[in-house]
Amino acid sequence: MKRVYSNKIPSKIEKDNSGYYLYRWNIQEEQNTEYNGYSYYEVTVWPTLTANKILETCINELWGTDVEAKKLNDYNAALLGVLDESYIDIYKDFLQKRKELKEQVDSDFIAYEQMQDDQIVNK
């Protein structure tokens, strides 16, 4: 997945005028001789927006569809001795990265919902 670049700091969740949402994560400030701005990963999420829908979209963009099932099958095959034990570590590594992503998405989504609630109260 390629990083996206912007001259201004992006919001983590943004509703587009077309009705879909943009979710951005791993936002990093970039400073070098050619560019000062921000880089991040970005996915398009279609309504209705939920943390699980964001996570599913991110997983599909990062690893592709059905990758989780394939890694689980390889893991089980390694447990049964059909594949070597390296597949166990590959699956554990995937689960750790997925867990970290889920925690980030959940945190960002809670903050987004709170911001939306605050805007409704302040109207």
Language model region names:
Residues 2-123:
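A preference for well-ordered globular domain cores
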